[in-house]
Amino acid sequence: MIDIKLLRLNSEIFYKSCRDRGFDTRILDEFFELDNEWKENLKQLNNIKHDKNSITMEISRRIKSGDDINDLKLKVESLNIDIQRLEGRQNEIDVKRNEILRLIPNLLADDVPRCFGDENNRLVRYYGRARVFSDDVKYFIENSGSGDYEEIDYRPKSHVDLISELNLADIERAGKIAGARFYFLKNRLFKLELALINYAVDFLSQRGYTVLEPPFMINYKSMSGATDIETFKDTLYKIEGDDLYLIATAEHPIASMLQDEILMEDELPIRVSGVSPCFRREAGAHGKDTKGIFRVHQFNKIEQFVFCKPEDSWDFFDELVRNSEDIYKSLKIPYRVVNVCSGELGNLAAKKYDIEAWFPAQGKFREIVSASNDTDYQARSLNIKYRSRDGNRFVHTLNSTAIATERILVAIMENFQDRNGKVIKIPEVLIPYTGFSEIGGDDN
């Protein structure tokens, strides 16, 4: 939720920010119409209360002097009816206005590219030495800005083929019991997933992040405070008969755990890494990535989250991105970082960086990390403050993926298979966690 005082004082910057996002500015018109009605109604209410106070004082004077007060009592009764009517209307306007206020997106950071479409996200940097099939070289250079790659004369096997040939997952049987986009993860691929989780937890713990496992369900109040639930609702699984949803990301319960609290200044920053399954209906992804485990209804993710003071939030944004990059550098997975353009940002984010890994079998970069600075937008919705010398202030909240395991399993399978697709090498940093150095081959 945005700051209503800032909106009133700087309406034009919000109109521009909405236009830059491709957001319908009529919602701002509706807000100001209601806000003006709220102000006018409040003015009338205060005037009537003032009149009532004056009459009440006159009644007291007349009682002391023994004068008749019946006419004044009738006036007070009439004013009470008006007050009740105006207070009811004031509450109605307040509810509607706050509902609209929740829909107005966050102000964009100055360096967010003002454009539309994922293809217009701005390249920030590239890392790694990718294996690139000859047919994909032109795309790779254009989208990485790098000439650092190894050209290969064969297309690596897709992870769909690898999990079948190496007996790493059973999607067909999962489909019998749960439908499309579910899977049984098996054998060394499952152990590799556990290794990724434990590696990421240790990695972030060493950098001062408190690891936790959040509840896997969240109530409506918390969910609507943590995210734009109207945008997210087609993605969420609702628990029938309960005020609960399965979580789509650990971000939402972590953000909500401090709702309606006032922290002490010296408690900040609070760094958290959350480990959880994520449940998503993927209603808007019909026809996309229908095979394999790249886009599924259930996956595991390690999320980074920070509560901090406003003046520190951009430093923590850089820290979150750096943490994620360092993880993928250590795994030796080639990737690029992009500054997501205004038309592709969700309502909460003032700015978002995506990290996209190179997937040589697909011949393209695909998103594996999203890092966002939500400034005070999320904290206002959840009412999370801290006590400073200048009074109570809203914290800033930031979040970033560390590892979404299924996508990284796919990245490892595509990037580290041998020429024949018979053996998948395990990244060196994961071998102490797996106890094996490859999938396939003679030692399996």
Swiss-Prot record:
<dbReference type="InterPro" id="IPR045864">
    <property type="entry name" value="aa-tRNA-synth_II/BPL/LPL"/>
</dbReference>
<keyword id="KW-0648">Protein biosynthesis</keyword>
<feature type="binding site">
    <location>
        <begin position="280"/>
        <end position="282"/>
    </location>
    <ligand>
        <name>ATP</name>
    </ligand>
</feature>
<keyword id="KW-0030">Aminoacyl-tRNA synthetase</keyword>
<feature type="binding site">
    <location>
        <begin position="249"/>
        <end position="251"/>
    </location>
    <ligand>
        <name>L-serine</name>
    </ligand>
</feature>
<dbReference type="InterPro" id="IPR002317">
    <property type="entry name" value="Ser-tRNA-ligase_type_1"/>
</dbReference>
<dbReference type="GO" id="GO:0005524">
    <property type="term" value="F:ATP binding"/>
</dbReference>
<dbReference type="Pfam" id="PF02403">
    <property type="entry name" value="Seryl_tRNA_N"/>
</dbReference>
<feature type="binding site">
    <location>
        <begin position="367"/>
        <end position="370"/>
    </location>
    <ligand>
        <name>ATP</name>
    </ligand>
</feature>
<keyword id="KW-0436">Ligase</keyword>
<comment type="function">
    <text>Catalyzes the attachment of serine to tRNA(Ser). Is also able to aminoacylate tRNA(Sec) with serine, to form the misacylated tRNA L-seryl-tRNA(Sec), which will be further converted into selenocysteinyl-tRNA(Sec).</text>
</comment>
<keyword id="KW-0963">Cytoplasm</keyword>
<dbReference type="InterPro" id="IPR010978">
    <property type="entry name" value="tRNA-bd_arm"/>
</dbReference>
<dbReference type="InterPro" id="IPR002314">
    <property type="entry name" value="aa-tRNA-synt_IIb"/>
</dbReference>
<feature type="binding site">
    <location>
        <position position="401"/>
    </location>
    <ligand>
        <name>L-serine</name>
    </ligand>
</feature>
<dbReference type="GO" id="GO:0016260">
    <property type="term" value="P:selenocysteine biosynthetic process"/>
</dbReference>
<feature type="binding site">
    <location>
        <position position="303"/>
    </location>
    <ligand>
        <name>L-serine</name>
    </ligand>
</feature>
<keyword id="KW-0547">Nucleotide-binding</keyword>
<protein>
    <recommendedName>
        <fullName>Serine--tRNA ligase</fullName>
        <ecNumber>6.1.1.11</ecNumber>
    </recommendedName>
</protein>
<dbReference type="GO" id="GO:0004828">
    <property type="term" value="F:serine-tRNA ligase activity"/>
</dbReference>
<dbReference type="GO" id="GO:0006434">
    <property type="term" value="P:seryl-tRNA aminoacylation"/>
</dbReference>
<keyword id="KW-0067">ATP-binding</keyword>
<comment type="similarity">
    <text>Belongs to the class-II aminoacyl-tRNA synthetase family. Type-1 seryl-tRNA synthetase subfamily.</text>
</comment>
<dbReference type="InterPro" id="IPR042103">
    <property type="entry name" value="SerRS_1_N_sf"/>
</dbReference>
<dbReference type="InterPro" id="IPR033729">
    <property type="entry name" value="SerRS_core"/>
</dbReference>
<dbReference type="GO" id="GO:0005737">
    <property type="term" value="C:cytoplasm"/>
</dbReference>
<comment type="subunit">
    <text>Homodimer. The tRNA molecule binds across the dimer.</text>
</comment>
<dbReference type="InterPro" id="IPR006195">
    <property type="entry name" value="aa-tRNA-synth_II"/>
</dbReference>
<comment type="pathway">
    <text>Aminoacyl-tRNA biosynthesis; selenocysteinyl-tRNA(Sec) biosynthesis; L-seryl-tRNA(Sec) from L-serine and tRNA(Sec): step 1/1.</text>
</comment>
<dbReference type="Pfam" id="PF00587">
    <property type="entry name" value="tRNA-synt_2b"/>
</dbReference>
<feature type="binding site">
    <location>
        <position position="296"/>
    </location>
    <ligand>
        <name>ATP</name>
    </ligand>
</feature>
<dbReference type="InterPro" id="IPR015866">
    <property type="entry name" value="Ser-tRNA-synth_1_N"/>
</dbReference>
